[in-house]
Amino acid sequence: MLVKVYGSAVFGVEATTITIEVNIVKGIGYHLVGLPDIAIKESNFRIAAALQNTGYKIPGKKITINMAPADMRKEGSAYDLSLAIGILAANEQIQSDEIEKYIIMGELSLDGGLQPIKGALPIAIQARKEGFKGFILPAQNAKEAAIVDNLEVYGVENIKEVINFFNGERELVRTIVDTRKEFYKNLEFPEFDFADVKGQETVKRCMEIAAAGGHNIILIGPPGSGKTMLAKRLPSILPPMTLHEALETTKIHSVVGRIKDTGLMSHRPFRSPHHTISDVALVGGGTYPQPGEISLAHNGVLFLDELPEFKRAVLEVMRQPLEDREVTISRAKFSITYPSSFMLVASMNPSPSGYFNDPEAPVNSTPAEMQRYMSKISGPLLDRIDIHIEVNPVPFEKLSDDRKGESSSEIRKRVIAARNIQTERFKEYEHIHYNAQMNTKQIQKFCKVSEESLKLLKNAMMKLNLSARAYDRILKVARTIADLEGTDNVQPHHIGEAIQYRSLDREGWFGNS
């Protein structure tokens, strides 16, 4: 008897429906075709044990299973449940015409229990798109899949529940999530707050400018000056995620199985990989490509602590995704594109010893050591970082002050107002949403400056020996400062403030010339 069951495969952040055809005839043998990987080929052992331990059995006949489309490689153990249901239906241990109306996915334990799967959200989205009635999956993934409207989602604990459901012996409890309610309930409660930061008013101002214009930023300071603390609080002042952004972000985290029992992600992600990370782990890849850290930081913040400690080759592969806001991973027979629109926040010590030009420091590095230290960060990468700011240690008087600083919610209000101005400014441009994304043509159009401002900029570049690449960055940051003030034109004092935020472009900094 021939039976069809439907599962799904995830490629990139999109799902493709897989038709599982199970045919049972007289004879012996178990044949599984359609480019399954090792985990799927091993499923017959898990299925046999699970069925035996729940009172069922694999028939002693010839079983042929085809996973179509046959030219698409399938991977993982998430097909266990669909294969098992297909075998039972083909052997008439399940009597139902409803099986073909559902996507069925789940990894089987030997006792018949179900383990969670990866990619439940994109699978649910594709199931709704193709008109399936429902999605049966492990209970741990039910809330995540139930984000999708107009699709019946049933979370189950074991295979026996599914068998009894299709045999009409029991009803399954549908998982229902009020997506908007869940999303907005968690939206206003960031984990960290700028009110906790003592002192560092100049750096806080820089973080506000970076958030308002989407500018990448690097923090330079000795150990213990608060660089990591400041970076962790940046997501709390970024504009709240829209429902569309939240869905997009949740899909990526779903693919790697990082969604717990939370459903829709409502906070912007903050990713902080260790400096020993490989290039594949950072940008994504592998034999079966998976999203990397830059994609997991999509719509959020990627924090690279101790930037010069990262391998130069690892940093270099990040250059193109920073520019394109996406990363494409190519293999011989296919390519996958992951979104990677994130804000880069980097931090570094001012020298290998951690101190620079500090007479009280116990160790100072030689010029040669500092040159080697800085050479790990290439010019093209620094070219993509708009704001460089030095972070100094906080004096004892400010550390011991009990007064709270300005809260993240207050700063966020100003950031949102500035972003609204930019949304209106760039409404005719499809791929530009904030100031950091402007190219030379848009800078000329939207960052017009007076003769006085030009004179100030020229003098600063000559006296401070700023590099040529700093020119456009200064104008973009100045435009954001003007937006925060709500002024139409870039004024001289906006230029003056933006010039301060180009520390690494100054001649003499680590031997720059």
Regions inferred by a protein language model and the residue ranges of each:
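Basic, amphipathic alpha-helical bundle interface domains used for macromolecular binding and assembly
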Residues: V33, A39-N44, P59, N66-G76, ...
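Peripheral, non-AAA+ core regions of ATP-driven protein-machinery
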Residues: M1-I218, P222-S225, M265, S330, ...
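Walker A/P-loop
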Residues: L219-R258, D324
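Short beta-strand elements
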Residues: I18-I24, L282, D386-I389
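The Walker A (P-loop) glycine that initiates the GxxxxGKT/S ATP-binding motif of P-loop NTPases
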Residues: G221, G284, E306
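Walker B catalytic acidic pair
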Residues: N299, D305-L307, V317
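P-loop NTPase nucleotide-binding/switch module
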Residues: R170-I209, G213, P240-I294
